[in-house]
Amino acid sequence: DEWFPYWRNFCMDWIVKLGGNPENLRFRDHEKEELSFYSKGTTDIEYKFPWGWGEVWGIADRTDYDLTQHQNTSGKDMSYLDPITNEKYIPYVVEPAVGVERLFFMFFTDAYDEETLENGETRVVMRFNPVLAPVKAAILPLRKKYAEKAEEIRHELSYDFAVTYDEAGSIGKRYRRQDEVGTPFCITIDEQTMEDGTVTIRYRDSMEQERMTVEEVRNKICKEIRF
């Protein structure tokens, strides 16, 4: 009985750690009349979609039904001998069944944000957990004359995570483009980069910036995208 609640909690924690909003999530235990004939208990993790609550993950306690049926059909003994208690039994199966498309839609829905800035402008941001962001960092040369150095840094960082390069338009417009697609980090190459090798890293969610070496940037981003 302990493994069914374990997997219920494991699946919920997994969603939340990857950016699912706990306020939009809930457990729903199936009523007795809803249960499949093989199930001792089934719980759905439901998400509050724009149109209402819907299942994103189902966890079912299938008891020993699956292995018993396999044993009866194949003639192969599916029992397990506990080396400590010397007890022999057919193991129970807990089945967490999830649809990838629903999960993606859930994460997209939770990540989307329209933020009103101090100047009255609206900033569209996809606040993906860095682990899920398709592109982890954007390399942005402040001027085109820094393009060669920027490309060198892009190439260096691309060994560790997905990096994009953008030199079109003002730096502000480039920040906004990266915010809209959910890139968590922007790395700006400027005159000081040419002098001492440091770059500016800008954080998508807070828009705050820090100055550091490329190696420090690499270590910081690698830490943020580790799961």
Task: Enumerate the predicted regions with their spans.
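NTP/phosphate- and nucleic-acid-binding module
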Residues: 1-227
